[in-house]
């Protein structure tokens, strides 16, 4: 996958197109990511120990990884991802600026 947990990404398609957020979780087997504040859905929860009231909760749902692009740290714009080997390690680079995306 071209994005990781903690990356700042921009949604490029779907109902939340244009929104930015941080990746909270990544699901590589399903090719999906959970982005903060994006794809909010209503979940009907039964009363439980943690939530004795129950009711309808708003929460984020995962979106497909092809619908997000990482934000270039240099320009602040969405960019595609390239890979380069530096010091024997494979690192992700921003195609627009050549800046390293991995911290």
UniProtKB/Swiss-Prot annotation:
InterPro entries: KOW (IPR005824), Rib_uL2_dom2 (IPR014722), Ribosomal_uL24 (IPR003256), Ribosomal_uL24_CS (IPR005825), Ribosomal_uL24_KOW (IPR041988), Translation_prot_SH3-like_sf (IPR008991)
UniProt xrefs under Pfam families: KOW, ribosomal_L24
Gene Ontology molecular function: any one: rRNA binding
Any single GO CC term annotated in Swiss-Prot or TrEMBL for this entry: ribosome
Domain of life, source organism: Bacteria
Classification via Gene3D superfamilies: 2.30.30.30
Secretion signal, residue range per the UniProt entry: none
Annotated keywords: Ribonucleoprotein, Ribosomal protein, RNA-binding, rRNA-binding
CDD domains: KOW_RPL26
UniProt keyword Ribonucleoprotein present: yes
Protein's GO biological process: translation
Cited NCBIfam families: rplX_bact (TIGR01079)
Subunit note: Part of the 50S ribosomal subunit.
Family per similarity comment: Belongs to the universal ribosomal protein uL24 family.
Function: One of two assembly initiator proteins, it binds directly to the 5'-end of the 23S rRNA, where it nucleates assembly of the 50S subunit. One of the proteins that surrounds the polypeptide exit tunnel on the outside of the subunit.
Protein name, per record: Large ribosomal subunit protein uL24
Lineage, broadest ranks: Bacteria, Bacillati, Bacillota, Bacilli, Bacillales
Gene of this entry: rplX
């Amino acid at each position: 996958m071209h994005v990781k947990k903690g990356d700042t990404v921009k949604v490029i398609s779907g109902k939340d197109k244009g929104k930015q957020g941080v990746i909270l979780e990544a699901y590589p087997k399903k090719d999906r990511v959970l982005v903060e504040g994006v794809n909010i859905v209503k979940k009907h929860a039964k009363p439980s120990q943690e939530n004795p009231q129950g009711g309808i909760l708003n929460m984020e749902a995962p979106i497909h990884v092809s619908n997000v692009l990482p934000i270039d740290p240099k320009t602040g714009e969405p960019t595609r991802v390239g890979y380069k080997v530096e010091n024997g390690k494979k690192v992700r680079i921003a195609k627009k600026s050549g800046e390293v995306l991995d911290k």
